[in-house]
């Protein structure tokens, strides 16, 4: 199979915001306890954080981490997680039928985020709480001192404010599964008033308002329009969430699911622009795709997990090589929309539908999906370019006619590099690929990294953590994308 990839330096999509390489840690399963935080672990540092996990997070290249939820946040009292640990209450976590010990809270999280070099993105509870609690949390985190909650923070040993810039106004508030779920009118009014107050406390804060939980919600579209009609002047981003799975075992269709993400982004962008015009606003609403991933492997086993325990093994998907190809396609799609998608969070980060897995008290390792994210975060910087691909296509079930090759090119003027990310979806044909970049002169190919495996169901485990591992190909004049492979091709100019 032949493929041609075209891009032009003079026609960028836009700058790639580093926050598109974000992730998510929720108080759910073993994400926090036994993942991020495990004081008795051999690698634990002075704060109880697992050093082996922090090294993997840094290697992954995560730039921002959303916290503490997720569904969890809609029943969370942030005050439970501050001050002396021995005084913190144990609470029922109704979102995940677990016990929350509150041994990790906002102060510990921001300390951990600083250690891994990621910006924190805090969510406030708009399920059981509202304006007052959000105001107080913002004051505790970001006000210098001389007030009740800023001085409370200082009394806890944190003299300087945390300076948390990014905040989520609740989570999936349209969902019937959500604690304190709301109609679009109810949520829109509450989110608008909360946003006003939070920005009065800290004018530098940047706020994300909840979009629909997914495109199958009966109010999808109407929800976005209604919520934005109340909040457009007060918030900076609208959230999108989407997960994909292969329950039917149809690999060809599964590999095309990024087409659904593409249409989702286009639809929500159009709704945002419609509200913008109706309000005669000069502000563009950006998107925060703050939950995206493959999620389906753990659905059945989660039904067997004992309820009302601390850190139960929930949502522990073990990812295949096939899943890594899908994650690669989803990353490419996000980058192709970098003019609107300014924040994105791979959900989640540790143990829970995550690229990083741990044994409580034991080993840690990188799952298959770790590597496409790591490559994009490391190499796809600067500007994304309008990228066109000419290649064969196939019928992908509900996603329709789908090109075999999915690709995006990025250019970084600061170091004069060009990166091409590409997935070959074909089951049996390599793609001999020609890349043409206009407006940049001659290109020199510097590197070709590939992630491939003969077994689509291959996984990495604690005992075999390198079964699916990227490798460098020998450089040659021809660029060949192997059948069912993830590729990173680096050029300089």
Regions found by a protein language model. Give the residues of each.
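Non-catalytic accessory regions flanking glycosidase/transglycosidase catalytic cores in CAZymes
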Residues: 1-223, 228-237, 261-262, 266-300, ...
């Amino acid at each position: 199979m032949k493929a041609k990839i075209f891009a032009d330096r003079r026609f960028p999509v836009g700058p790639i915001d580093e926050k598109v390489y974000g992730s998510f840690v929720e108080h759910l399963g073993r994400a926090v306890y036994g993942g991020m935080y495990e004081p008795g672990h051999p690698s634990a540092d002075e704060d109880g954080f697992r050093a082996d996990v922090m090294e993997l997070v840094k290697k992954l290249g995560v730039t921002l981490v959303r916290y503490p939820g997720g569904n969890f946040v809609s029943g969370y009292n942030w005050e439970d997680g501050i001050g002396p640990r021995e005084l913190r209450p144990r609470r029922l976590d109704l979102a995940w039928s677990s016990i929350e010990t509150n041994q990790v809270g906002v102060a510990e999280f921001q300390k951990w985020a600083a250690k891994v070099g990621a910006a924190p993105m805090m969510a406030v509870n708009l399920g059981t709480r509202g304006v007052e609690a959000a105001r107080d949390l913002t004051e505790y985190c970001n006000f210098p001192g001389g007030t009740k909650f800023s001085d409370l923070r200082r009394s806890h040993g944190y003299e300087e404010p945390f300076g948390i810039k990014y905040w989520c106004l609740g989570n999936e508030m349209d969902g019937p599964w959500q604690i304190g779920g709301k109609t679009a009118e109810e949520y829109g009014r509450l989110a608008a008033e909360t946003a006003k107050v939070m920005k009065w406390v800290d004018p530098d804060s940047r706020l994300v308002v909840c979009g629909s939980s997914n495109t199958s919600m009966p109010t999808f579209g109407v929800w976005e329009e209604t919520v934005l009609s109340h909040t457009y002047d007060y918030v900076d981003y609208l959230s999108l969430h989407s997960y994909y799975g292969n329950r039917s075992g149809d690999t060809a269709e599964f590999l095309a699911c990024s087409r659904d993400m593409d249409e989702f982004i286009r639809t929500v962008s159009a709704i945002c622009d419609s509200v913008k015009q109706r309000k005669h606003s000069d502000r563009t609403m950006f998107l925060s795709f703050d939950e995206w991933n493959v999620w389906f492997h753990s659905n059945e086993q989660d039904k067997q997990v004992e309820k009302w325990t601390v850190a139960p093994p929930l949502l522990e998907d073990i990812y295949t090589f096939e899943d890594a190809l899908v994650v690669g396609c989803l990353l490419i799609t996000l980058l192709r929309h970098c003019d609107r998608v300014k924040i994105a969070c791979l959900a989640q980060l540790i143990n829970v539908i995550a690229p990083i897995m741990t044994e409580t008290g034991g080993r840690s390792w990188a799952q298959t999906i770790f590597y496409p994210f790591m490559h994009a975060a490391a190499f796809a910087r600067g500007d994304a370019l309008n990228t066109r691909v000419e290649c064969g296509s196939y019928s992908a079930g509900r996603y329709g006619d789908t090109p075999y090759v999915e690709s995006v090119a990025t250019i970084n003027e600061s170091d004069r590099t060009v990166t091409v990310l590409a997935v070959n979806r074909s089951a049996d044909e390599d793609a001999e690929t020609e890349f043409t970049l206009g407006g940049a002169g001659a290109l020199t190919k510097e590197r070709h990294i590939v992630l491939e495996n003969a077994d689509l169901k291959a996984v990495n485990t604690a005992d075999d953590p390198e079964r699916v591992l990227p490798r460098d190909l020998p450089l040659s004049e021809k660029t060949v994308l192997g059948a069912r492979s993830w590729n990173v091709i680096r050029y300089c100019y």
